[in-house]
A protein has these predicted regions:
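Alpha-helical elements of Rossmann-like donor-binding domains used by nucleotide-donor carbohydrate transfer enzymes
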Residues: 52-55, 83, 123
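Conserved catalytic core of nucleotide-sugar-dependent glycosyltransferases
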Residues: 117-193
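Short beta-strand-to-loop acidic/aromatic patch adjacent to the donor-nucleotide binding site
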Residues: 94-115
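Residue-level marker for beta-strand->alpha-helix junctions and adjacent short loops that shape enzyme
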Residues: 43-45, 72, 114, 121, ...
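Short, conserved alpha-helix that lines the donor NDP-sugar binding/gating region
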Residues: 77-100
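N-proximal low-complexity "stem/linker" segments adjacent to membrane-targeting elements
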Residues: 2-75
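Acidic helix N-cap motif at the loop->helix transition within catalytic regions
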Residues: 48-50, 80, 119
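Structured loop/turn residues at beta-strand edges in well-structured enzyme cores
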Residues: 65, 102, 127
Length: 193
């Protein structure tokens, strides 16, 4: 530095990252003493799924939750979901899950191709909503499982397809939001809904 000069400057201030309101400890408090029924439609899973599922089960039990598993298969996924709930089409439309005989606080639906971890589960719990879903990409890698209704004219213009969120639009979202449609691949439902 040149003789006679003194540099006086403040350290540049870092912009604070937006605070994530999520607290895993609060989510653990919400789930303590509760029963979660894992609803698993399908025939088989990958080792990636299996490792994540076993870890989630372990973490929930360690947090003081109880777990149950309801798994069934049909080539028609909507029927497989009904079977997971113990439903029977011959008993009509007014049925309760497992005929009301299974005591539970939450149903957690996980499709066999979903990649997840325990934190993602706790984020659903932390929302404390009747229905909370996580999003995931569909097979094209660009469209997501989340959609919004369109006005009838716009629906026709869109080829009869709802207005789905894209990978790009979801990357801009930082907080939970309301949607009109969600896939059932990763969804948490409270008892009584």
């Amino acid at each position: 530095m040149a003789k006679g000069f003194t540099v006086k400057a403040d350290v540049p201030k870092k912009k604070a990252a937006p605070a994530d309101e999520f607290s895993i400890e609060k989510a653990k408090e919400l789930i303590r003493g509760k029963t979660v029924v894992f609803c698993l439609p399908g025939r088989g899973v990958s080792y990636i799924f299996l490792k994540a599922f076993v870890q989630l089960c372990f973490d929930l039990v360690q947090s003081g939750a109880q777990i149950q598993i309801s798994q069934d298969y049909s080539s028609m996924v909507n029927f497989a979901r009904c079977k997971c709930l113990g439903a029977n089409v011959l008993r009509g439309p007014d049925q309760k899950p497992w005929d009301g005989k299974l005591k539970y606080d939450y149903q957690l639906w996980i499709d066999s191709d979903i990649v997840f971890d325990t934190e993602k589960f706790y984020r659903l719990v932390y929302m404390d909503k009747d229905i909370a879903a996580g999003w995931y990409c569909t097979e094209d890698g660009k469209t997501t499982s989340i959609a919004h209704w369109l006005e009838e004219g716009d629906f026709r213009k869109n080829g009869g397809v709802m207005n789905h969120e894209t990978l790009e639009s979801m990357s801009k979202r930082t907080k939970p939001f309301t949607c009109d449609y969600t896939g059932f691949g990763w969804v948490l439902i409270k008892n009584g809904v």
